[in-house]
Amino acid sequence: ADIFGPSVPKMFQVEDARPYAEQIDGRDLIIPIEKYGIKLLSIGFFVDPDQATLWRGGMASNALKQLIGDADWGELDYFILDTPPGTSDIHLTLVQTLAITGAVIVSPPQQVALADARKGINMYTNDKVNVPILGLVENMSWFTPAELPENKYFIFGKEGAKQLAEEMNV
């Protein structure tokens, strides 16, 4: 499930797919799009991908609840949610709505982004939330141009997520 954008439809190359509703046990449920054996729902299926999603916290939280609760997910091995960076109403709604068994924090290596990752780790490990951090993934670690495949350019810094993981015992 992807709350704010077209990321999931783009990554799975299903931008033109449209989920539909089906009545199951007297309830109208959204049938997720399925690709590669993975069930997908994203706000990107319901809004124009070129338009900004301008929602206040409550609207975004309600959309998240609908993506989670009003869909026929069936039996799942894992339920993965792509959330925006930081700590927001979305994250609070998530931990209040689902019994979360773990979180994976994704961050590029630059210090500004790592500050958000640090806040996310602190939020999930807070005594009131108590969600274990399963790992910290460094995204956009380096750039390799096609014409120089042996070169790596660390344009956002180097090993920032690794340093944060060590600092926070993740």
Task: Name what the model sees in each region.
Residues 1-4, 136:
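Walker A/P-loop phosphate-binding motif and the immediately C-terminal alpha-helix
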Residues 3-50:
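Phosphate-binding loop that captures ATP/GTP phosphates
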Residues 4, 60-64, 113:
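Internal, well-ordered alpha-helical segments in soluble enzyme and binding-protein domains
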Residues 8, 41, 64, 82, ...:
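Residue-level signature of catalytic and energy-coupling elements of molecular machines
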Residues 14, 73, 129-131:
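Helix N-cap/coil-helix junction residues
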Residues 18-23, 42-93:
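Switch II (G3) loop of P-loop NTPases
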Residues 77-78, 84-170:
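Conserved catalytic-core segment of NTP-binding enzymes
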